[in-house]
């Protein structure tokens, strides 16, 4: 993510824009979706719950929560150089992620407000929360002599298109996993105050409730759309032409049936859960491990707790969840983390690029094999996993 150059406290110019702008599979992305399909969504199946959640958003419980106090004064100067770098990296990623959510929710609220006002209002309230979070994180970065240029970011970041159903799945998991991440850190630091390296963590208890409410919204939204958005299967683009001729009617019916079959929902549930869990685990046990160590957390134990809790929570809305209790689940993720270390070691060697690529190929194949085995692991039926809740 790009960020503005700001003079640090020691008057040394700092510019990390190029580093942040560099995208990888593990960095937060910016998203767009099918706004026409979203505005046509029929919420009548679960409108009462969505209206109740919107009323919760209107109350804005955290309106006066994100107010900096005297604890922030000079707090950045007390952090050693190594921990400082780790924490700034955490702030950058978190701010980018929150701002990404703001842009998506804000654009949705603007595009669908005329035809789907209830949905638009919910997205507007969530955009408010995400903007507040991003701004608060950006102020903490300013304590370290840095600041993200959010305007530049909006104009220059590439946007990834996801169909509405993919947005529902991925964002629900993202919001719920955010809740468990923040509350786990907050509870740990309550018991171990020596690991509280910056006063930002004092705000995590109320902060995580925003994430939880956002997740509840997507839960209710998916209940209002038990299969998928109808317009997903009504057209397909080939060489710039839309197949709307009656001759393609049976083709569209088949695509609609395929997209809406319960088995497909189960496959998508497994895919998005695994994608989010694997990405977090690989990142946290790879490049972020030392940051959690600075907080006094064991990164592996922390991630496994968060994954288990998010998986359990997801059983409230997804038809199946991952069997994270199978002994092979975390072993395979650990193998991918180990492979990541091997890839980094290859990059450090002064060998020709061809040699590096050939050396990495077996590792990439190994990673793909582990992910396929994880995906094919027999899932847990949510009705059996949490019958009392469902």
Swiss-Prot record:
SUPFAM superfamilies, per database record: Ferritin-like (SSF47240)
An example Gene Ontology biological process: light-independent chlorophyll biosynthetic process
Catalytic reaction(s) noted: Mg-protoporphyrin IX 13-monomethyl ester + 3 NADPH + 3 O2 + 2 H(+) = 3,8-divinyl protochlorophyllide a + 3 NADP(+) + 5 H2O
Pathway: Porphyrin-containing compound metabolism; chlorophyll biosynthesis (light-independent)
Annotated coiled-coil segments of the chain: none
Disulphide-bonded residues: none
Enzyme class label: oxidoreductase
Known cofactor(s): Fe cation
Keywords assigned by UniProt, alphabetized: Chlorophyll biosynthesis, Iron, Metal-binding, NADP, Oxidoreductase, Photosynthesis
A molecular function GO annotation: magnesium-protoporphyrin IX monomethyl ester (oxidative) cyclase activity
Database matches in InterPro entries: AcsF, Ferritin-like, Ferritin-like_SF, Rr_diiron-bd_dom
EC number, as in UniProt: 1.14.13.81
Role noted for this protein: Catalyzes the formation of the isocyclic ring in chlorophyll biosynthesis. Mediates the cyclase reaction, which results in the formation of divinylprotochlorophyllide (Pchlide) characteristic of all chlorophylls from magnesium-protoporphyrin IX 13-monomethyl ester (MgPMME).
Homology family: Belongs to the AcsF family.
Cited HAMAP family: AcsF (MF_01840)
Protein name: Magnesium-protoporphyrin IX monomethyl ester [oxidative] cyclase
Annotated source species: Prochlorococcus marinus subsp. pastoris (strain CCMP1986 / NIES-2087 / MED4)
Name of encoding gene: acsF
């Amino acid at each position: 993510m790009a960020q503005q150059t700001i003079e640090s406290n020691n008057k040394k110019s700092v510019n990390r824009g190029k580093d942040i702008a560099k995208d990888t599979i593990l960095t937060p992305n910016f998203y767009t979706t099918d706004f026409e399909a979203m505005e046509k969504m029929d919420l009548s199946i679960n409108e009462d719950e969505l209206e109740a959640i919107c009323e919760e958003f209107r109350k804005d419980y955290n309106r006066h929560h994100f107010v900096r106090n005297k604890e922030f004064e000079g707090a950045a100067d007390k952090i050693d150089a190594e921990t400082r770098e780790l924490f700034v990296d955490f702030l950058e990623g978190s701010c980018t992620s929150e701002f990404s959510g703001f842009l998506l929710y804000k654009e949705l609220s603007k595009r669908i407000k005329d035809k789907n006002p209830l949905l638009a209002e919910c997205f507007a309230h969530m955009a408010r929360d995400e903007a507040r979070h991003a701004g608060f994180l950006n102020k903490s970065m300013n304590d370290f002599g840095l600041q993200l240029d959010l305007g530049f970011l909006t104009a220059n970041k590439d946007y990834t298109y996801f169909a509405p159903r993919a947005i529902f799945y991925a964002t629900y998991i993202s919001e719920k996993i955010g809740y468990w991440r923040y509350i786990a850190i907050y509870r740990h630091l309550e018991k171990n105050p020596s690991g509280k390296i910056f006063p930002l963590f004092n705000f995590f208890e109320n902060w995580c409730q925003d994430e939880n409410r956002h997740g509840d919204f997507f839960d209710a939204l998916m209940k209002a759309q038990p299969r998928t958005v109808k317009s997903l299967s009504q057209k397909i683009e080939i060489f710039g032409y839309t197949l709307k001729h009656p001759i393609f009617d049976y083709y569209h019916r088949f695509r609609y049936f395929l997209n809406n079959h319960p088995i497909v929902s189960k496959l998508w549930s497994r895919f998005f859960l695994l994608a989010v869990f694997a990405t977090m685990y690989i990142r946290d046990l790879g490049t972020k491990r030392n940051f959690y160590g600075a907080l006094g957390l064991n990164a592996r134990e922390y991630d496994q707790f968060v994954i288990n809790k998010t998986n359990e929570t997801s059983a409230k809305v997804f038809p199946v969840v991952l069997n994270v209790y199978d002994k092979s689940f975390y072993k395979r993720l650990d193998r991918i983390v180990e492979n990541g270390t091997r890839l980094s070691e290859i990059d450090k060697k002064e060998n020709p690029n061809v040699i590096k690529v050939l050396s990495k190929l077996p590792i990439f194949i190994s990673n793909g094999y582990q992910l396929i085995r994880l995906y094919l692991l027999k899932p847990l039926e949510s009705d059996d996993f949490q019958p009392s809740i469902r």
